[in-house]
């Protein structure tokens, strides 16, 4: 009987350790560290002349607020998937991101390395997206706007 109790305790501990492991998102990959709001602070080791905020949600969706090609913020939404350390995404209109990104999240910094012929390195920092940017951002465009990702 004593050995059955010891076995039960060992099994419960094993189950607890497995249950407390890193959480994976609904479509794979480690989204826990990525979840939250980010602001672009460096683009190819230089301060960007444009603004990009991204809110990565733990359910695999995102909202991106960019002031790249216009004076106003543009809102792009969609879904993302992480496979290993590579993130890819699709916009709400069904178009894919320009490329995939190898990602690294450490101490509130997200580094994204584009997987294209000439790699671009983007550095983001955790932030709170200002409410006025969220309120101002528009999905209505007078001209064709190219999304940042």
Regions found by a protein language model. Name each.
Residues 16-19:
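C-terminal motif of bacterial Sec signal peptides marking the signal peptidase cleavage site
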Residues 1-8:
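Bacterial N-terminal signal peptides that target proteins for export
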Residues 8-9, 36:
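A ubiquitous, low-specificity "background" feature that marks scattered single residues
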Residues 21-76, 83-149:
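Lipid interaction determinants
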Residues 11-14:
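Repetitive helical segments and hydrophobic/amphipathic motifs
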């Amino acid at each position: 009987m004593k050995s059955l109790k010891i076995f039960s305790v060992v099994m419960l501990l094993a189950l607890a350790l497995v249950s407390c492991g890193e959480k994976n998102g609904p479509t794979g990959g480690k989204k826990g560290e990525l979840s939250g709001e980010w602001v672009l602070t460096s683009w190819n080791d230089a301060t960007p002349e444009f603004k990009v905020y991204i809110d990565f949600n733990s359910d695999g969706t995102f909202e991106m607020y960019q002031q790249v090609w216009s004076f106003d913020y543009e809102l792009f939404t969609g879904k993302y998937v992480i496979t290993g350390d590579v993130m890819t995404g699709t916009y709400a209109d069904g178009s894919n991101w320009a490329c995939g990104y190898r990602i690294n999240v450490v101490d509130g910094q997200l580094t994204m390395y584009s997987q294209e012929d000439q790699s671009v390195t983007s550095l983001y920092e955790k932030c709170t997206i200002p409410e006025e940017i969220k309120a101002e951002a528009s999905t209505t465009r007078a001209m064709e706007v190219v999304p940042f990702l």
